[in-house]
Amino acid sequence: MARRKAAPKRETLPDPLFHSELLAKFINAVMRNGKKSVAEKIVYGALDVVAKRVQNKSGEQGDGDGEGGGKAGGIKKRSLGDIRTDENARALALETFKGALDKVMPNVEVKSRRVGGSTYQVPVEIRMARRQALARRWLVEYANKRNEKTMVLRLAHEILDAVEGRGGAIKKREDVHRMAKANQAFAHYRW
């Protein structure tokens, strides 16, 4: 155990476009080598793709909502400016993102506990801040592992898959829950 005091919680400034602390933390999770503007472009671009895909699914079904077909219709013309100007698209993208994060958040995890010479995997409940942190981390990690061409598309498709209950991040959550369920016999070792 650490002998120092717990680190003080730092206040996170909300992101400039959506005014959401949750999204600001997600941008920080996407950020590499301190390049925040690049991370913002990736996240906002992904949310733009998510908003368009959700609008296409709910609204105009006839235009074709798959990514095939090249430059179909007006999708390529107004690629990034859409969520920056359209309030409805912005709200839709944020709701979809929050839904994806909620579906990826784990409830329990296993922690190693050494008792009498043997190590047990003890299931413990996770506090909310860690749930969100794990969900953000898994979304970014499994978006990186996808095969789409750009990180914008990878992240957008991972978010959409998470909302629909599939994808790598959801699989990771199910694996963590399965491990906790399998080791439920050791729950009385909880501390």
Curated annotation (Swiss-Prot):
Role of this protein: One of the primary rRNA binding proteins, it binds directly to 16S rRNA where it nucleates assembly of the head domain of the 30S subunit. Is located at the subunit interface close to the decoding center, probably blocks exit of the E-site tRNA.
NCBIfam families attached to this UniProt entry: rpsG_bact
CDD domains: uS7_Bacteria (cd14869)
Keywords recorded for this protein, A-Z: Ribonucleoprotein, Ribosomal protein, RNA-binding, rRNA-binding, tRNA-binding
Identification of the protein by name: Small ribosomal subunit protein uS7
Record region (Disordered): 56-80
GO CC annotations on file: small ribosomal subunit
A Pfam family recorded for this sequence: Ribosomal_S7
GO MF term (any one): structural constituent of ribosome
Subunit (UniProt): Part of the 30S ribosomal subunit. Contacts proteins S9 and S11.
Family of the protein in this entry: Belongs to the universal ribosomal protein uS7 family.
BP GO terms, sorted: translation
PANTHER family referenced in this protein's UniProt entry, alphabetically: RIBOSOMAL PROTEIN S7
Superkingdom assignment: Bacteria
